Amino acid sequence: DDLGDAQRRAADWLLDVTRTGAGTHLLVYPAAGMQPAMRATKRRATVDVLTSDVDQISHMREALVLEGADDSIHVERIPGVVPNPKQWRGHYDAIVTVEKVEQLSPQERKEYIRAVDRFLTPNGRAGIQSLVATEAMTDAGKASIQALRAYVWPALDYPLTAELHQLVDKNSNLRIVSETHVGTHYLESLRQQRSFFDGHLREAAAAGFDPVFRRLWTFQFALREALMTLGMIDAVQFGLAHRNRGGRR
């Protein structure tokens, strides 16, 4: 289907950014879905997926069994959004994050990028997909996000691209080595997601999602679609590498 194809393409682009291939040890963190992990197994990579969401873990593991990928992908629970060095010690050739940075508080963003720095091997690559604010963002646009912050993502804040560069430069030994704007692709994906959800409202109701939740989910798709159509937000894939071959400072 069109939506599935779009999601697979976006995942493949991030895997290309991180040079994921046969033998790569990939970390998907924090988990936002299984598409990057599933696509990585097609390249014969070994994948760890980290999440702090207990409910998400059971759904992910069920999906892995259905796909026959439970031998190549390992889903692990971490105590919080960002694990400290004692809670997770792994080192990885590649790290992928999809649309999580914008949902973190300012302090969590700093801790997150330090964790990526810590987890990434000296010659590894990280790929981060994030929604960002553009110079076209207005006060009205910012105000509209308050609803998403109140009911969906409490810490939601779309950073400027320059702010993400500053985050990386000031809090890690990493640097952004590539930046690809994929807003046009993302906008079409949003439209497809909204259409798919609207076409399956009965199934959502049967699964236990009440009318308020269903309307809220349709609203968040429509709002993000509107902000992107107006050019107030963009979708960007960043490629990161260590500044020197020595890796972590």
Region spans (language model):
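Conserved SAM-binding loop
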Residues: 60-61
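Conserved SAM-binding strand-loop segment of SAM-dependent methyltransferases
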Residues: 67-84
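Helix-to-beta-strand junctions that scaffold the AdoMet/dcAdoMet cofactor pocket
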Residues: 69, 104-105, 120-121
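A short acidic, Gly/Pro-enriched loop at the edge of an enzyme's catalytic core
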Residues: 83-96
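A short glycine-rich, Lys/Arg-flanked "PGG" loop and its adjoining helix->strand segment in the class I
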Residues: 110-125
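Substrate-binding/catalytic lobe of Class I Rossmann-like enzymes that use SAM or dcSAM, i.e.
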Residues: 132-237, 241-248
